[in-house]
C-alpha cells in the first residue's frame, strides 16, 4: 500500500527525561518503516536528543530516510500551554538555543538549578523571529484564553503559528476537534494534526506508565488518572492518521506544508574554532611553527637529526593543510598556563602520536624512542578534528578549567555533557517502587547486582535474593527494568571536555548550569559533538599527578632537591625495574591492581617499552582476543616468534611484520588491530575509520560487532588462519569495552615509571603524598602505611603536639624521614584543604567580577587576573597568581581568610602550639578553644599521647570538661566545681580495642592488625595465615581467612571475581569462579572478614592464587575484638571500652543495643572495582 503523506511534528523522546518512552533512534526507524514524510523531535525544553536522531539517518539499515525536523517543546512556568517551536533556518535555530540557554542559566541573582529550565511566555518573544510555533491545547481548554495566546503569537515576528489538533481517545474526540477547528478558523491560524507521540510503538506503553510513576513518585496502584488512558500515543502511519482526522483532512495536509516551510538541518551548523591571538605580523600557522622549532631546540638541542626534522615538517604541513593551527595553540596555551602555576600536566591518548605535541610540551612520549603513528591522531582521509586529552593534577584542575572559561568567555566555552543512563541497580529500584514492591524487595534485588553495567537480572540473581523468578510481579519488574536500562536519566557534565567556538556557543546548542558553582555545560555529549565535527579540548584530572607533585614538594622541602617530571629518566635505574619484577607496585600508577601485580613477575619489565606493554596487556582487548598467553610464552622463549601471513597468491608473507614485530607477532594495541584490518582484511579507509570509531566508543560494543563478518571472512579468504582471524576480532570487541592504543599506553607508562621511581628511592615522600592525595587508587590508607613500613619507613601516630593537617615528614637518624600522620586522617575532623580553598577564592573573585552583568545576554566575562599564563619558564612555580599553592605544611598554618579559623580545627591547634607548648589536655582545650566534638575526635584518635594520656584517659578527661570553653573570669570557679575524677586511675585499654578504635577513627592502626587477635581462634580451625598461603604447594586444599581489601569483577573476566584478603602477615589473592560466585554471592559481596576454602593455584613465576570452593562470612568475629570477649578478663567497675561522642546509653532498652560496643562500623568497607 502506498503510504499516505503525513509528517508527525509532536514527538517526545526519552530525552524529555521520564516523559518519553522511546529512544530517538527508534523513532527514526519506525518513521522509515511507516514511510512518513517527516518527523519532528520536540523534547521538553531541550535539544539533547536531536543529534542522536540526526546520526541515525546515516544508518545503512535505513532503506528510506524521512525528513527530520529539530525543535523543542516549551514548557512554561507561568501556566501557558506548551508550544512546539521549530526554527525555519540556521539563524532561527541559534535563537532557539539562546532562548533555552536563558531558561537554563538564569542570572547571577537568580541562578537556575542544574537540570531545570525556567521560561515565561514573555521570554519567547525575545527570540521568536523565524520560529514556527504550534500551540498545544491542554485536555481541557478555555477558547478565549487560547484565542488570546494565538492572537499574541500572530502579532509577533514568528515565521508562522498553528493550533495543534490531537485525539485523546476518550469518546469525545470528534466534538473536541470540531471546537479546535472553529477556534483555529476564528484566530485565522491553520489546524495541524499530531498524535502528540510519547513512544514509537504500542509495546512501549507499559514502560511509559512506569516512567510516569517514577516521575510522579507514585506507584501503579496510587497514580490514578495521571497515567495515559490507553496505548494510542505512539507513532502512527499516514493512513491511520488520515482515518482519525477524516473530518479534518486539511489538518493532515497542513503537516506537509509545515514541513516544507522548514529549511534548517543540523548539516548547516558550520563549526568554527576560535582564533588564537598571535604576535603582530604572524599567522597562527607561522606562530605554531616558531613554537615548534623553539621547543625542538629546547628538548633535543644538537640531537635534532634529519629524521626528526622530517617528522616535524610532515606534521606541520598536515596541520597547515587542515587549518588546525589554532587548536594546537589553544592546548599549548592551556598547558603553559598550568605549568606557570606549578600544576603538573601531561597529554595522552592519540595526541601522544604527535612529535609536534611533544616539543610543544603537551605530551611526554619522546618521538625518538617510540614509533609514532601520526595518522591515528590526524588524517586528511578521515576529516575529523584532532582530539588532545591533557591530564592535570586532580586537586588543581579546577583552576585550569576556570582559566579556560575566562580565556574565552562563557558565551564561547562550555563543558560537554555526559548522559547518565539507567543501569541495573537504579533501574530495578525505580521500577520496583513504581510497581509497588516493598523497599526490602527492591533493595535485595539491587544488592545482587555487581557494579554499574549489565543487561538486567538473571533468574539466578532473583533466586539469590530469596525470591521466586516466576512470580508474575517479580518477573514483570525484572523485564521492565531490563527495558529501562540505557534510558537517559539526566544530563551531567563531562569529566573535562570543553567545546570552544569563534562565535557564540549558545547559537549552536543550549548551555545550562552544572551542579558545581561556576561550571556550565552544553546539552550534547562527546558522541554528539563528534558527529557534528566540533573540536573539543579535554581538561582531565589525574590523582597520580597530584600525588607526584606533592611528592616532589616534600622531597624539595625535606631533602633539598627539586624535581620536575622531565628529570626522571625511564632508562636510568635498573633497581626500579627489579622492584616491579617482584610485583611490588602498591600505589604505583596503573600497575597496582591485582591483575597487574600478578602480571609484573610474569612479564618482568626491563625497559620503558616493557612498561608500555604492561599498561596495555591487562585490558579487555588483549584478554578477550586470547593474546596475553601467546605473548608471554614468546617473551619467555617458550614459543617461537612467528608472524601470521596470507596465502602466497594473496600477498607477501611479511605483510604484518611491520605491524606486529614490536609485540612478537601478537597484536596488543588498538593501532595494531586497525592496521590488521587494513593490511590483512583489506578494509577501505572508510571501513577502517568506522572500525576505529567503534573501538573508541567505550562500552558500546554493539557498534563493533557489525564489522565482524567482513573482517573475519576477508582474512580467511586471503589465507589467514581462521583461529587467528577470529581472535583478532575478539580482541577488537574487547577494545569496544576498554583498550589502550600504544600512544596512550606510552603516556601512562611515563607516570608508571615516575611513581615507581618515587616509591623505590623516596618511599617516605611517596607514602606521605599518597595519603595526602586520598581518595585514589586501589588501596586504603592502612595498606599504604603497611607497605611503607615494610619498606623501612617509620610511621608516627597523630599527635596534637606534632601533627599538621596534612601528613608530613619528620627527620630521623635513618635513611628515610618518618611519616607523621596528620589530622586529615581523623574521620569527621575539620580542616581546610588549601587546594580547595584556592579554588573557592578564585570562584568568589569570578562571581564578584561578573555579578553586575546579566547572563540573559551572555556577554564575554571580563577576565580575572591569571598572571603567569605567558611565563617563559614552564617549570616555574613562582608566578604572580595570588592563589599559589603553599610550598609545605608550615604554610598551612596561615589560613586565607580569618573567618576560616573557626572551621579549621587543625589550624587552631597549630597556631596555639606556636604560641607555647601544650602541657595538659585542659591547657590544650583552653588555648585552642576547640568545640567539645573536636576534642572527642582527637581523644578517640589517641592523639594526646604527648600529654601523657592514652585514648581512654583522654576520653574521660574530655568528658569532664564543660561543653563550652569558659571565659577566664569563670575558669577558677568552674575548676573548683569539677570533681577530681583524675585521681582514680583507669585500667589500661586492651590492645585489641585500641586497634579497632584506630580503624574506626583513622582507618588504620600502627598498633596491630585485627586478625592477629583472632589468630588463635582461626588457627584452631586449621586456617592458614596469608603469608603461608603464598608458600603452599600447587593444588593443595587449604583454608584462609582475612579482611577483604579489594573486590574486582572485570568485564573481561567472564564473571570471575578476584578478592584480596589481608591479615597481620600479608595478603592472599582469591579467585571466585562464576558458579561459586552465584552460590556464595552474599558472602562475596558483603563480608568484611571472610574465610575461604579452596585449592592453591601456583604459576612457575610463583604467582599464587587460592581458588575458592566455599566462603564463610566471619564478619561477626570482629565484634570479639574487646579483651573481655576474647579472653573473658574482668575490667572492674569502669567501662572497658572508650566512649564515642555519638554513644548513647540505653541499658533499659535492648532494642537500642548494637553488636559492637563502640556503636560505629567495625572496619572500613573494601574497595570494589568492576
Curated annotation (Swiss-Prot):
This is Error-prone DNA polymerase. HAMAP family: DNApol_error_prone (MF_01902). DNA polymerase involved in damage-induced mutagenesis and translesion synthesis (TLS). It is not the major replicative DNA polymerase. GO terms for cellular component: cytoplasm. Keywords: Cytoplasm, DNA damage, DNA repair, DNA replication, DNA-directed DNA polymerase, Nucleotidyltransferase, Transferase. It is found in: Cytoplasm. It comes from Bradyrhizobium sp. (strain ORS 278). Residues 886-899 have a biased composition (Basic and acidic residues). Coiled coil: none annotated. It catalyses: DNA(n) + a 2'-deoxyribonucleoside 5'-triphosphate = DNA(n+1) + diphosphate. Disulfide bonds: none annotated. NCBIfam families: polc, PRK05672.1. Residues 867-899, 1129-1170 are annotated as: Disordered. Pfam families: DNA_pol3_alpha, DNA_pol3_finger, HHH_6, PHP, tRNA_anti-codon. Its EC number is 2.7.7.7. SUPFAM superfamilies: PHP domain-like. GO terms for molecular function: 3'-5' exonuclease activity; DNA-directed DNA polymerase activity; nucleic acid binding. The gene is dnaE2. GO terms for biological process: DNA repair; DNA replication.
Amino acid at each position: 500500500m502506498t503510504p499516505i503523506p503525513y509528517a508527525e511534528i509532536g514527538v517526545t523522546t526519552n530525552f524529555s527525561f521520564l516523559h518519553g518512552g522511546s529512544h530517538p533512534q527508534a523513532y527514526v526507524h519506525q518513521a522509515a518503516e511507516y514511510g512518513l514524510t517527516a518527523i519532528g523531535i520536540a523534547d521538553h525544553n531541550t535539544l539533547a536528543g536531536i543529534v542522536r536522531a540526526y546520526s541515525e539517518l546515516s544508518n545503512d539499515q535505513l532503506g528510506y530516510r524521512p525528513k527530520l525536523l529539530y525543535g523543542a517543546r516549551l514548557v512554561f512556568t507561568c501556566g501557558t500551554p506548551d508550544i512546539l517551536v521549530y526554527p525555519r533556518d540556521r539563524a532561527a535555530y541559534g535563537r532557539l538555543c539562546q532562548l533555552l540557554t536563558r531558561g537554563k542559566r538564569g542570572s547571577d541573582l537568580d541562578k537556575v538549578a542544574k537540570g531545570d529550565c525556567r521560561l515565561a511566555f514573555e521570554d519567547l518573544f525575545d527570540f521568536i523571529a523565524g520560529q514556527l510555533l504550534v500551540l498545544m491545547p491542554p485536555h481541557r481548554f478555555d477558547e478565549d484564553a487560547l484565542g488570546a495566546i494565538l492572537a499574541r503569537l500572530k502579532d509577533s515576528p514568528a515565521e508562522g503559528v498553528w493550533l495543534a489538533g490531537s485525539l485523546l481517545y476518550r469518546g469525545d474526540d470528534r466534538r473536541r476537534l470540531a471546537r479546535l477547528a472553529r477556534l483555529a478558523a476564528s484566530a485565522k491560524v491553520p489546524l495541524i494534526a499530531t498524535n502528540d507521540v510519547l513512544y514509537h510503538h504500542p509495546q512501549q506503553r507499559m514502560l511509559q506508565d512506569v516512567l510516569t510513576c517514577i516521575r510522579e513518585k507514585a506507584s501503579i496502584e496510587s497514580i490514578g488518572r495521571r497515567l495515559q488512558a490507553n496505548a494510542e500515543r505512539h507513532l502512527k502511519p499516514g493512513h491511520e492518521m488520515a482515518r482519525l482526522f477524516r473530518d479534518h483532512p486539511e489538518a493532515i495536509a497542513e503537516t506537509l506544508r509545515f514541513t516544507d516551510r522548514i529549511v534548517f538541518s543540523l548539516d548547516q551548523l558550520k563549526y568554527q574554532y576560535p582564533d588564537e591571538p598571535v604576535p603582530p605580523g604572524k599567522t597562527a600557522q607561522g606562530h605554531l611553527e616558531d613554537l615548534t622549532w623553539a621547543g625542538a631546540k629546547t628538548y633535543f638541542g644538537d640531537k635534532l637529526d634529519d629524521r626528526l626534522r622530517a617528522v616535524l615538517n610532515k606534521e606541520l604541513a598536515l596541520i597547515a593543510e587542515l587549518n588546525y593551527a589554532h587548536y594546537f595553540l589553544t592546548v599549548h596555551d592551556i598547558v603553559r598556563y598550568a605549568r606557570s602555576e606549578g600544576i603538573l600536566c601531561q597529554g595522552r591518548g592519540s595526541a601522544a602520536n604527535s612529535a609536534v605535541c611533544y616539543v610543544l610540551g603537551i605530551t611526554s612520549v619522546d618521538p625518538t624512542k617510540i614509533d609514532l603513528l601520526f595518522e591515528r591522531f590526524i588524517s586528511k582521509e578521515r576529516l575529523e578534528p584532532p582530539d588532545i586529552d591533557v591530564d592535570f593534577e586532580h586537586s588543581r584542575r579546577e583552576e585550569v578549567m576556570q582559566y579556560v572559561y575566562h580565556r574565552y568567555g562563557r558565551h564561547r566555552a562550555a563543558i560537554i555533557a555526559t548522559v547518565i543512563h539507567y543501569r541495573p541497580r537504579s533501574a530495578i529500584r525505580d521500577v520496583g517502587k513504581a510497581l509497588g514492591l516493598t523497599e526490602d524487595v527492591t533493595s535485595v534485588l539491587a544488592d545482587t547486582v555487581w557494579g554499574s553495567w549489565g543487561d538486567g537480572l538473571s533468574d539466578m540473581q532473583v533466586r539469590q535474593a530469596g525470591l521466586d523468578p516466576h512470580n508474575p510481579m517479580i518477573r514483570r519488574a525484572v523485564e521492565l527494568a531490563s527495558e529501562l536500562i540505557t534510558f537517559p536519566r539526566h544530563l551531567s557534565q563531562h569529566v573535562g571536555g570543553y567545546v570552544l567556538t569563534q562565535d557564540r556557543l549558545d547559537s549552536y546548542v543550549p548551555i545550562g548550569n552544572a551542579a558545581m558553582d561556576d561550571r556550565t555545560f552544553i546539552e550534547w555529549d562527546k558522541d554528539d559533538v563528534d558527529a557534528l565535527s566540533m573540536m573539543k579540548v579535554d581538561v582531565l584530572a589525574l590523582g597520580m599527578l597530584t600525588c607526584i607533585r606533592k611528592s616532589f614538594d616534600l622531597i624539595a622541602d625535606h631533602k633539598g632537591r627539586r624535581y620536575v617530571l622531565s628529570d626522571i629518566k625511564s632508562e636510568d635505574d635498573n633497581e626500579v625495574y627489579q622492584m616491579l619484577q617482584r610485583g611490588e607496585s602498591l600505589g604505583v600508577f596503573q600497575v597496582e591492581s591485582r591483575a597487574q601485580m600478578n602480571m609484573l613477575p610474569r612479564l618482568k619489565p626491563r625497559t620503558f617499552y616493557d612498561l608500555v606493554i604492561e599498561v596495555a596487556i591487562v585490558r579487555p582487548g588483549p584478554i578477550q582476543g586470547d593474546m596475553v598467553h601467546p605473548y608471554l610464552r614468546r617473551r619467555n622463549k617458550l614459543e617461537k616468534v612467528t608472524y601470521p601471513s596470507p596465502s602466497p597468491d594473496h600477498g607477501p608473507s611479511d605483510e604484518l611484520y611491520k605491524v606486529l614485530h614490536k609485540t612478537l607477532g601478537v597484536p596488543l594495541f588498538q593501532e595494531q588491530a586497525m592496521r590488521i584490518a587494513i593490511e590483512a582484511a583489506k578494509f577501505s579507509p572508510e571501513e577502517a575509520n568506522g572500525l576505529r570509531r567503534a573501538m573508541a566508543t567505550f562500552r558500546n560494543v554493539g557498534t563493533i560487532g557489525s564489522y565482524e563478518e567482513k573482517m573475519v571472512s576477508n582474512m580467511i579468504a586471503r589465507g589467514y588462519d581462521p583461529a587467528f582471524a577470529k581472535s583478532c576480532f575478539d580482541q577488537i570487541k574487547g577494545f569496544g569495552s576498554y583498550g589502550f592504543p600504544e600512544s596512550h599506553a606510552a603516556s601512562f607508562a611515563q607516570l608508571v615509571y615516575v611513581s615507581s621511581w618515587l616509591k623505590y628511592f623516596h618511599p617516605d615522600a611517596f607514602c606521605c603524598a599518597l595519603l595526602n592525595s586520598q581518595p585514589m587508587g586501589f588501596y586504603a590508607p592502612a595498606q599504604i602505611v603497611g607497605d611503607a613500613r615494610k619498606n623501612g619507613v617509620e610511621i608516627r601516630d597523630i599527635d596534637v603536639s606534632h601533627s599538621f593537617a596534612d601528613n608530613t615528614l619528620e627527620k630521623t637518624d635513618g635513611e628515610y624521614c618518618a611519616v607523621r600522620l596528620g589530622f586529615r586522617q581523623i574521620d569527621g575532623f575539620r580542616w581546610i584543604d588549601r587546594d580547595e580553598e584556592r579554588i573557592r577564592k578564585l570562584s568568589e573573585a569570578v562571581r564578584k567580577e561578573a555579578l553586575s552583568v546579566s547572563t540573559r545576554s551572555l556577554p564575554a566575562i571580563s577576565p580575572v587576573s591569571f598572571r603567569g599564563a605567558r611565563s617563559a619558564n614552564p617549570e616555574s612555580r613562582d608566578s604572580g597568581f595570588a592563589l599559589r599553592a603553599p610550598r609545605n605544611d608550615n604554610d598551612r598554618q596561615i589560613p586565607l581568610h580569618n573567618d576560616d579559623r573557626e572551621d579549621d580545627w587543625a589550624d587552631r591547634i597549630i597556631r596555639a602550639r606556636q604560641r607555647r607548648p601544650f602541657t595538659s589536655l585542659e591547657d590544650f582545650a583552653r588555648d585552642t578553644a576547640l568545640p567539645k566534638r573536636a576534642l572527642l575526635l582527637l581523644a578517640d584518635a589517641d592523639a594526646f599521647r604527648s600529654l601523657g594520656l592514652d585514648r581512654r584517659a583522654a576520653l574521660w578527661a574530655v568528658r569532664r570538661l564543660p561543653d563550652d570553653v569558659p571565659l577566664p573570669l569563670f575558669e577558677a570557679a568552674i575548676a573548683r566545681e569539677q570533681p577530681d575524677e583524675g585521681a582514680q586511675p583507669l585500667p589500661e585499654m586492651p590492645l585489641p580495642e585500641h586497634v579497632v578504635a584506630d580503624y574506626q577513627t583513622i582507618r588504620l592502626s600502627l598498633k596491630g592488625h585485627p586478625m592477629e587477635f583472632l589468630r588463635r581462634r582461626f588457627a584452631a580451625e586449621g586456617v592458614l595465615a596469608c603469608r603461608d598461603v603464598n608458600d603452599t604447594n600447587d593444588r593443595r586444599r587449604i583454608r584462609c581467612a582475612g579482611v577483604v581489601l579489594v573486590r574486582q569483577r572485570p568485564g573481561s573476566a567472564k564473571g570471575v571475581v578476584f578478592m584480596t584478603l589481608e591479615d597481620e602477615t600479608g595478603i592472599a589473592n582469591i579467585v571466585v569462579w562464576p558458579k561459586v560466585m552465584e552460590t556464595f554471592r552474599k558472602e562475596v559481596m558483603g563480608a568484611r572478614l571472610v574465610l575461604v576454602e579452596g585449592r592453591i593455584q601456583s604459576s612457575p613465576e610463583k604467582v599464587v592464587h587460592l581458588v575458592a570452593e566455599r566462603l564463610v562470612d566471619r564478619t561477626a568475629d570482629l565484634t570479639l575484638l574487646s579483651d573481655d570477649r576474647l579472653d573473658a578478663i574482668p575490667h572492674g567497675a569502669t567501662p572497658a571500652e572508650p566512649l564515642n561522642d555519638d554513644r548513647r546509653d540505653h541499658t533499659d532498652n535492648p532494642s537500642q543495643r548494637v553488636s559492637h560496643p563502640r556503636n560505629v562500623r567495625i572496619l572500613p568497607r573494601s574497595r570494589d572495582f568492576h
